[in-house]
Amino acid sequence: MAKRTKKVGIVGKYGTRYGASLRKVVKKTEVSQHSKFFCDFCGKYGMKRQAVGIWCCKGCNKTKAGGAYSLNTGGSVTVRSTIRRLREATEK
C-alpha cells in the first residue's frame, strides 16, 4: 500500500498528480465509503461497504442497498422524510 501522510490522508496515494482541488473531492468520497454507518436494524455503527451500492452490517449481518459511496443518498433522505411526513398527516 502506498504511503500516506497526516495532512492529505487517504489521497496520499496519488502523490502530486491530478491537482489539489480534485484530490480534495476524491478524499471526501473515499473517506465516506470507508467509514462505518449506523445500522437501522440493530442500532450499531457496523454498516460497511461490500461493493458498489451494497452495504452489510457486521453486527446483525443484514445487507442493505444504498448509495455507491455513502449509505444514504440525497434522494433517499428526501423520500424518507416525505414518507414520514405523510404518515404523520394521515394519523392525525
Swiss-Prot record:
Annotated keywords: Metal-binding, Ribonucleoprotein, Ribosomal protein, Zinc, Zinc-finger
UniProt GO molecular function: structural constituent of ribosome; zinc ion binding
Matching Gene3D superfamilies: 2.20.25.30
Similarity-based family: Belongs to the eukaryotic ribosomal protein eL43 family.
GO biological process: translation
This protein's GO CC annotations: ribonucleoprotein complex; ribosome
Protein's UniProt name: Large ribosomal subunit protein eL43
Superkingdom: Eukaryota
ZnF (C4-type) intervals: 39-60
Residues annotated as transmembrane: none
